[in-house]
């Protein structure tokens, strides 16, 4: 369950910090959030897909660590990102 190239590019252009940004923590969190939402839909239709569930939990953990890093560096940027992505934490 990966993102298509057009979906990924849309997320990159809307969340990049500067013009050539392709891997900032904010952008990584946005990409992970998009993948997590897709995988959540897949798991609702396929509840016995345990391999995908494990991948989902790993992505959630990675996103949580990135969000903790952003919060430790700049809490206002963290709050803005959480609000913009619509995730609760």
From Swiss-Prot:
GO molecular function: rRNA binding; structural constituent of ribosome
Pfam families (UniProt xref): Ribosomal_S15
Family: Belongs to the universal ribosomal protein uS15 family.
Keywords, sorted A to Z: Ribonucleoprotein, Ribosomal protein, RNA-binding, rRNA-binding
Keyword RNA-binding: yes
Superkingdom, taxonomy of origin: Bacteria
Gene3D superfamilies: 6.10.250.3130, S15/NS1, RNA-binding
Name listed for the protein in its UniProt record: Small ribosomal subunit protein uS15
Example of a GO biological process term: translation
Subunit structure: Part of the 30S ribosomal subunit. Forms a bridge to the 50S subunit in the 70S ribosome, contacting the 23S rRNA.
InterPro entries from the UniProt entry: Ribosomal_uS15, Ribosomal_uS15_bac-type, uS15_NS1_RNA-bd_sf
Gene: rpsO
GO cellular component, one term: cytosolic small ribosomal subunit
Purpose of the protein: One of the primary rRNA binding proteins, it binds directly to 16S rRNA where it helps nucleate assembly of the platform of the 30S subunit by binding and bridging several RNA helices of the 16S rRNA.
């Amino acid at each position: 369950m990966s993102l298509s190239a057009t979906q990924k590019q849309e997320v990159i252009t809307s969340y990049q910090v500067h013009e050539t940004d392709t891997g900032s923590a904010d952008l990584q969190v946005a990409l992970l959030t998009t993948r997590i939402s897709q995988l959540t839909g897949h798991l609702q239709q396929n509840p016995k897909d345990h391999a995908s569930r494990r991948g989902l939990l790993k992505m959630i953990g990675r996103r949580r660590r990135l969000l903790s890093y952003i919060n430790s560096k700049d809490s206002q940027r963290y709050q803005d990102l959480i609000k913009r992505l619509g995730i609760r934490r």
